[in-house]
Amino acid sequence: MSSTSTRVFKVGIGRFVQQDFNQKAYVRAMRLALLHQYTRLAGLRVSMKEHHGPFFKNYTFFIRHQWAMLNEDIISDMIPQPIHGLYSVTYLGSSSILCKSQIILEKQQKCISTCIAQAVCVSLQNRKPVSFPVAIKEIYSYAALGARPQIAPLLATPEPTQQQIGIQKAFIGETDVDENGHTNNTAYLQFCSDVARKAATDKMFTYVTPDILDSRLKKYTIHYIGETVQGDEVTFTSWQDLQNEYLLHFEAKKDDRVIIRCQFGF
């Protein structure tokens, strides 16, 4: 599929403000994750038009895979800074779409973060994947022309001899869930950040320090395997990969069931 066949939708966001930056003057990864989520949801609303309401009465999207790149060079002298999001669907399958969102600095016209997400159409009744309604297929028909994208295999965890471990339990709270009662994608990223920071502060890792967590996160990848709801207790485990000091691995489990696997790259 040529790039000219992709329809791009602009989404108004607002500004970066001081609270969006950490002590090292880098944009917080969680802030960018929230902006990508907002851009994706707003992009769906704009692109679906009058079909948006009827669709979400019977269906919703489950994010199966998410990859984001963050530009670490954005510093505090750029705030206050107007920003907007760009949203596009780059591939349409029978029950999933590949969404691309970008966060753009309006003054410099510079993309500071790109996110690719595989969104699966699921029934609201049982959360099982279903085929898109005909109306939705027609909206994104232009995205069905390309070759099926290669989705990365499920993230693996390091072997015991290749890792250092930090473990932390968390309860899913009221502010962590969406309107359907399921945990927001960005909440998992925050929990991973929290367990990494505690492990780094407790000097569980050889290489990754709290200072690095504040300044050098360049990308993250998340594979969503299961779901949680308010009140669930989830165990988050983080590993520093001793064979690749620039990677942190994460796994979240409810009882013995894997919910997510995630990587932070520095």
Name these PLM-found stretches.
Residues Y59, Q109, P160-Q162, D214, ...:
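A generic structural signal for short, solvent-exposed coil/turn residues
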Residues M1-R40, A117-Q118, V122-R127, F132-A135, ...:
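Catalytic strand-loop segment that frames the active site of acyl-thioester-processing enzymes
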Residues A170-Q263:
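Acidic/His-leaning functional-site neighborhoods
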Residues E50-N58, F62, Y87-V89, L217, ...:
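A structural signal for short, hydrophobic beta-strand segments that form beta-sheets
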Residues M1-P82, A196, A200, M204-L213, ...:
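Hydrophobic, proline/glycine-rich low-complexity stretches
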